[in-house]
């Protein structure tokens, strides 16, 4: 756990190109890089564990918020708010995951395509939208396309918040965005 957390912090702080075992070792306050090599066969395995840790934390936060709601419209709103809140309140984890995805996309590391796909996936959101449509809460829509649109909007709200209002509360943006999508896709 200590090594994985140090990996997340190192990736976020100095980026994947400089995230060596030595840098991670310093961050973890370990006496030797051999301790990392003992537990992990190489960077791909270590970065996989780091990404899985961030994804599990994000998914747990999302699931908890969504599960509290009883309607699909409310679940969608909770999903949007939880996503924006997680990303803006956990910038170290978010940046580390972004670094890993960028590494995979740039083909600078192999064996992590599944991790990058999981990080960029809109499958759970697509499923939520499809269930809401089937329950009659959302109008007829292409659930996958709408999930991609919502995902892009979330990314842009986060980017705007971080660049413009970095110290401000992200929740008002999140709630307004959730309201916009609710009005757009609610059954009439």
What are these regions (language model features)?
Residues 1-8, 24, 50-58, 125:
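Generic hydrophobic, amphipathic alpha-helix propensity
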Residues 3, 7-11, 83, 181:
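Short hydrophobic clusters on alpha-helical segments that form packing/core surfaces
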Residues 56-64, 89, 107-135, 144-148:
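Amphipathic alpha-helical packing segments from all-alpha helical-bundle domains
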Residues 63-93, 146-150, 174:
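Hydrophobic alpha-helical connector segments
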Residues 85, 122-134, 152-188:
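C-terminal peripheral helix-coil segments that are non-catalytic and often amphipathic
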Residues 88-109, 163:
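Amphipathic alpha-helical segments used for helix-helix packing
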């Amino acid at each position: 756990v200590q090594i994985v957390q140090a990996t997340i912090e190192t990736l976020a702080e100095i980026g994947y190109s400089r995230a060596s075992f030595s840098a991670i070792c310093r961050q973890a306050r370990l006496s030797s890089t051999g301790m990392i090599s003992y537990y992990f066969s190489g960077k791909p395995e270590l970065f996989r564990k780091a990404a899985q840790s961030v994804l599990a934390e994000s998914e747990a936060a999302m699931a908890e918020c969504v599960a509290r709601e009883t309607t699909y419209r409310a679940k969608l709103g909770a999903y949007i708010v939880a996503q924006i809140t997680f990303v803006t309140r956990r910038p170290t984890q978010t940046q580390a995951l972004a670094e890993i995805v960028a590494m995979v996309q740039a083909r600078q590391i192999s064996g992590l395509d599944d991790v990058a796909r999981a990080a960029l996936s809109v499958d759970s959101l697509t499923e939520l939208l499809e269930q809401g449509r089937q329950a009659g809460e959302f109008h007829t829509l292409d659930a996958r396309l709408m999930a991609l649109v919502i995902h892009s909007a979330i990314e842009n709200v986060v980017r705007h918040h971080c660049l413009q209002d970095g110290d401000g509360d992200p929740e008002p943006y999140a709630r307004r965005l959730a309201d916009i999508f609710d009005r757009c896709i609610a059954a009439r």
